[in-house]
Structures are given as structure tokens and as C-alpha cells.
Amino acid sequence: MARLVLCALALLVAGGLADPVRNNVPQKPADPVFAKRQMDLMTLFFHVLEPNYIEANKVIVNTWSLEKNIEHFSNVTAVTTYIKMLENQCCVPRAVPFSILEDEHKFEVVTLFNVLHSAKDYDTFYKTAVYVRDRVNPDLFSYVLSAVIVNRPDTKGIYIPRVFEIFPSYFNNGEIMTTAARINTHGDRLVDFYPSTYKWDKNVVIRWNPHLALLQQPEHTYSLLHSRLQPQLILLQRSLSLPGWLQTEALPVNQHRRGEWFWFLHKQLIARYYMERLSNGLGEIPELGHETVKDGTTRSFGTTMEFSSPVRPNNFNLDQPEFVNEVEQIYDYERRVRDAIDQGYVLNHLGERIDISAPEAIEILGRVIEANVDSPNVQYYKDFISVWKKVLGNSLVHEHQYFHHYIPLVVPSVLEHYQTALRDPAFYMIWKRVLGLFQQWQEKLPHYKPEELAMPQVAIEKVDVDKLVTYFEYSYMNVTSGLPMNVEEAKELYDQVSVLVQHPRLNHKKFQVRVNVKTEVAKTVLVKFFLAPKYDSHGHEIPLHVNSYNFMQLDEFVYDLPQGESVITRDSVETTGNEWTTSYQVWDQAEKASREKHLSAKNMYFQDVLIYHKHTLNPCSHVE
């Protein structure tokens, strides 16, 4: 068992990544108008593979016209473009998988986002969303609508159903989804017939049963930790609040330091993963070379279109004829970034030099490596990370294409979906390599001076941490929205059978951190807790200057230190936040708020986005 070190650091309230954190997110009054918007938008996500069943929405679908309402949009170009795309049927078909990494798919994403985001009022936005829901690819629609809700001021605070509630097939194997389909057909009358199901209150529960393929590879002894929902969903949330294809000017809510957050989030993920590997005896994260990838993955899933996602065998050979161009692209694009780091500057699209030799330049470097639209030169510093994902996902071959061979048919791998990428060990191999670029840049920065780090009036005397006790417990995922409604259900707009899937999750008992501090004068400080391994996989102590990149930030909070001796206490429940709210709970709350003005609804979705680097990346987080 690897030993971990907990560090406490007291700093003045300034700098770093402190400002996006919100320990106490203010409540948004849930007036009837807001509550109705919440309910209306939630209905667009539920049973998204099926047509609109709500009568009012049917009227909109049949009568609303983009052409006749074009004056209600600020981005007329996007609207006219999308009208032509719909007329000429050059959108991603509803019956094929969607991949945000495909340029043709991404073009429709950006166009539809600009249409919905540029609606001048909420009514136009909502009617347009209803209108396109039944006309476009459901995965694409759900992704775009989520991104718009996050970034429109008049939908701020709207809760977005979790992706596992919308598309449960991404998170459950074929056996589970087949059993769920049988329950959906037979109701609860055959529960006793299936050994994997039982009745719980008004729900039918499917017992957890991992696919036997997970036992075929040593890496999959870690399957429970790879499959944890929360980090996967946070990666998706980041892509919605700060999508790489959306310029900062169009982000009224989430436009702070996207390049730096890009680095920070993935550094947290890799640091956490490394500690979990050490704790489970899996050793170092393998290096990603240019010949063979030892660890394969059998983590396929049934897509919403009943395609099975590609898998990667063990000892996957990159030296294959079909990968030659892609591998050359990867090394060429990586070399351009390495050259820029060595030279101390990047070139913008005009050929002008932009200095990256200062610590603040991590924002520029992050944008360059992500190759997002705010990069100084996206035509030169290209997206090699996505190419890695396509190659290692083993999903490069497009056998059929649509709309005169313009739109490719690609069945994305686990790596190519934000909500599933962390299940593949190749994700961490890619990001170990990418973080090496950031580390190469950081090593060229000037060293901190003692006066920049020291707080001579504050001394940390001692840090005590309670014993950490972990255990597994079950959580329950509602998959009902992914099951088709029968005629009566569609008429009544109510699911007669609620199907839950049992999943194990790692939890821990409550513990406390105590920091004994001596202060010469009263001072307000920012306290940060970090967790890091003390020994590597060979049992050797890791030198601090080498280990710094393995430090994972657990928590940060503002604290008023009194003069003299004091003890800062922090409970684990303060670090991790509350249980995620389910869509059922939000719907019930919104329904009540639509009738009673005195109720209030928390700004739930934005709370998740703004504090994700605290609780979601904790390797022992009790939230799942």
C-alpha cells in the first residue's frame, strides 16, 4: 500500500486558481417563470431518442419556422446556414453515432450552438430548441443544448440532467440494458424470473454485474476506479462550459483563464490516477511511445444507435499502414509545441512572436496545446490530442459516408467521448505525455524567490489527519429515460416502470484535518490542502522537486487567523460537497416552485462547474 503525504499551505488571498471557487453558492429565487423554464428544458432531454410527446411541443414542431423568425436572432449567418443544412439534409443523421472530434460533426455543433445562443429572447430560444429536437442527431442535440444552457444568461441556474440519465447505454453494458428493456416491456410482473432483478419500493433494480471481459486484463483489476462517474462527468462539464470550439467572447459566464483550467483539470486527474495506481499495486503510468501500446481495453459500450464502440487489443501496434499519416501528424504537431517552448515564444497567425517565458503564459500555452479557437495560431499549432484519441481508440476507418461523401460514419471509441474517456488507460498515457510538455515549459521558468513563498508572520506547527477508512457501497442509476415509452406512457407523459441499476462506489468515513498555526498578527489567508505519494512503485522515496507534479489539490478555503496560536479544523464533508441532486428531485422541486413563490432552487449546475476541482478529483470522494 502506497503511503500518501498530506500538505497544508497557507497563502495570502490572491492569485492562483482561487477565484472560481464558490464554497457558498448563492441561491437563485425559483419564481414560477424560472421553474417553468426548468421543467420545459428538462423535458427536451428526457427520452431524447423518441419524438416530442407533449402536445404544445408538437404544435411548435409543426408550425415554427426559422425563416419567418430570422429577425429574432442576432447571428443571421448561422441561422441561414442551418436552414440550408436542414433543407439539404447535410446534418449528421439521427441514426448514426455522433463524435465531437469529427470536423464535420463539429461544424454542425458550432452552427447549431450559434443559432440557439443568438436567439434574442428566451421564447425564441426555446421554440427553436423544440423545433430542431426531432430533426437532428439526438446526441448532438443534447450536447449543444447543454452547452447553450450553460452559456446563455437567461438560462443561468437551469439544472441539466446528468448524461447517464439521458444516455444510460454509455454507462451500462449490454446485458444490463437488455434486462432493462425486458423490464420496460413486462413491467414488474417478471421480476422474480430474472435473478439479477428485485423490487424496491416502486422501482425495479438491476443488480450490478460487470462484464466478464473486464477480468481479462490486469489493468481491469482497477475497473471500479476507472468507471467512477464523477470525474468522467466533470470532464464533460468542462467541455460544455469552456468548449474548445467556442471563442471567449461568447462565454459571458465562464471566460476566466480557459488555458490554465485546461492544464489544471488534467493535472488533477493524472495526479489522482497515479496515486490510485500506486495504492492498487499497478505501478507507474506507462509511457506512450511510437511503437506498441501494451495495455488494451475491452471497455466497449452500446451507443445510442446500437453500434458497439471499437476496442483496442493488448500490445497494440502503432506501426501499421493505416496509422502512418496520423502518427506523423502527432509527432509533427508535438514538435511545433516543443520548439516553441525551447524558443520561449509562440507565433501568432501573423507570424508575430508571443512571449511564453513568464508564469502567466500558462494561459497561452494551454490554449495552444488544446488547439482551441482562442489559440494564437490554431492553423499551425494543431490538435494532436484528438488524433491520439482516434488512433488509440482504434476508430480511424470510415467505411461509409453521408451527404455525397461529406459526412463520415465513424463509431467513436471510449476515448472519444468526454463522458467515457477516463475508462481507457490510454487516456492517462496520453495526458502523461501532454503534461510533460507543460513540465518542460515550467522547468524553464525562473525559480521562486524565498520572499515570494514565505509568510514570516505565520508558522504551521503541526498537521494532524484522522485515519482514512474507505469502503464500498451501492448507488443507483436511473436508466428509465433511455427506455422507449409505450403508447399509454406517451399519452400520459409518465413512465409506468422506473428502472434503476445498482453500481458500487468507493466511499469513506468522515475524517478531519487539523492544522496548528501560530500567527504574530491577525491575518486572512487562503488555505490549500494537497495530497501526494511519498514513495514510487519501487518503494523509493520521491524527491520533492520531482514529486511536485504528483501533488493533487484536495481543498482550498479562506480562513481568518487570529493572533497567537490557533487550530484550523476542516471536516472531509466540507471538502467534498453534497450529494448530486437527481433529475427527479429537481423536477419535483421545480413543480412545487411553479405553484409556491416562497420556494427557492439552488444554482445547481453552476455549483458543480465552479467547484469541480475540489470534490470531484478527490480519490476518496464520497460524492458519486
Curated annotation (Swiss-Prot):
PROSITE patterns: HEMOCYANIN_2 (PS00210)
Keywords: Glycoprotein, Secreted, Signal, Storage protein
Signal peptide positions on this chain: 1-18
Main location as per UniProt: secreted
Name of a matching Pfam family: Hemocyanin_M
Family: Belongs to the hemocyanin family.
Protein name: Acidic juvenile hormone-suppressible protein 1
Lineage: Eukaryota, Metazoa, Ecdysozoa, Arthropoda, Hexapoda
